[in-house]
């Protein structure tokens, strides 16, 4: 018996943080991802491959990938995600990300990273990634491994504080990249082993948060309701 909503033909990443991040981003409108395959970003690669709504562009060289994403963003003025592995790979993004910052292009840079306890331990492909692009992005975010947040969440919509936190970061990153003066953001994701776990892909509803501009007109129906309430108010 197949669980309702499960697609037995498509394997999704077994990493819950990746699933939440990608589900929120696609629900908000992300439709194009430029990826540079590696080892540490395997959970992201599996997750992207499972989502048919995403246009995938695979470019092994990170510098070339970043400029390709920049070009797409310049033409479409829509958000484009960049995904790379850990280590020095993210610094190959820097020239294009700097250009995106000054051209006001909403690039969403997603970098895979080792868990923080492995940094500065002479482990291969590791460096201090959180904040590495701070001077050329609107904001940076760092998401700990799945096992880093296990406490229950006070919000009844979420099973754990981890799920709520990743949802919040995904929404905030997308909003920051696309609102006001658009620009790049950096989301660093820490992954521990194993990296290649999978689970059946399920389409699901996720919480999305959007900013309403201060000068946005109120819907006519709401204006009428407010007027009626004010007219009936006793002073």
Predicted regions and their residues:
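N-terminal alpha/beta PP-like core and its mobile active-site loop of ThDP/TPP-dependent enzymes
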Residues: 3-235
């Amino acid at each position: 018996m197949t669980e309702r909503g499960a697609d037995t033909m498509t394997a999704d990443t077994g990493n819950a943080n990746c699933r939440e991040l990608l589900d929120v981003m696609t629900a908000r409108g992300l439709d194009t991802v430029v990826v540079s395959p590696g080892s540490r970003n395997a959970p992201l690669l599996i997750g992207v491959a499972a989502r048919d709504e995403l246009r995938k562009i695979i470019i092994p060289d990170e510098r070339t990938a970043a400029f390709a994403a920049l070009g797409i963003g310049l033409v479409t003025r829509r958000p484009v995600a960049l995904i790379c592995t850990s280590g020095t790979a993210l610094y190959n993004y820097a020239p294009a990300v700097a250009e995106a910052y000054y051209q006001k292009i909403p690039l969403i840079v997603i970098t895979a990273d080792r868990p923080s306890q492995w940094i500065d331990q002479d482990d291969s492909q590791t460096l201090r990634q959180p904040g590495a692009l701070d001077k050329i992005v609107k904001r940076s975010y760092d998401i700990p491994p799945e096992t880093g947040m296990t406490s229950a969440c006070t919000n009844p919509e979420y099973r754990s504080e981890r799920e709520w936190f990743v949802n919040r970061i995904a929404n905030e990153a997308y909003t920051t990249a696309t609102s006001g003066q658009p620009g790049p953001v950096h989301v660093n994701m820490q992954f521990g082993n194993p990296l290649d776990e999978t689970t059946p892909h399920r389409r699901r509803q996720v919480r999305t948060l959007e900013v309403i501009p201060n000068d946005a007109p109120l819907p006519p129906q709401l204006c009428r309701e407010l007027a009626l309430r004010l007219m009936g108010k006793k002073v």
